[in-house]
Amino acid sequence: PAYMPKDMIFEMETSYKYIFKGEKDYLPFMEIRELHSSIKFQNINIETFKHNHGSIDVQTYRIGNFAYSTDLKKFYDNDIDKLRNLDLWIVGLLRDDEHPSHAGYDKIIEYINYIKPKKTIFTHMTALLDEKLLKSKCPKNVFPGYDGQIIEI
């Protein structure tokens, strides 16, 4: 299944009809399910909330003491408080400076200092980030991620 907020369902069904409804020689191969603020997948409880990604909203996911936020520009209201008491936060850092739809390094570090996760790993990084420089300025519990990385939660 593909989980998504209610406001995205029509757009996805229209833009990608062949995936969800089938079309011509395509059989449907995915089912849309509405994403609520809390979903249960098998035995796993997943909390979700929207955050801003420039001109659109995307989701942060929290599973126990782990959370994942990519394409993050800013949080709404007090939603950042939902990220307290994390063991691990994986968060997107597109580049060092601000971008119209992504927070820059300084803003992400501000978020980290506020929520105080035990460990943070950056993802969704571009080649514009110098890995050595990034590693040298990251706090001791903050690390750039890498392709193929295996993370135990």
Tell what function each PLM region has.
Residues 52-59, 63-92:
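Active-site-proximal loop/helix segments of hydrolase catalytic cores
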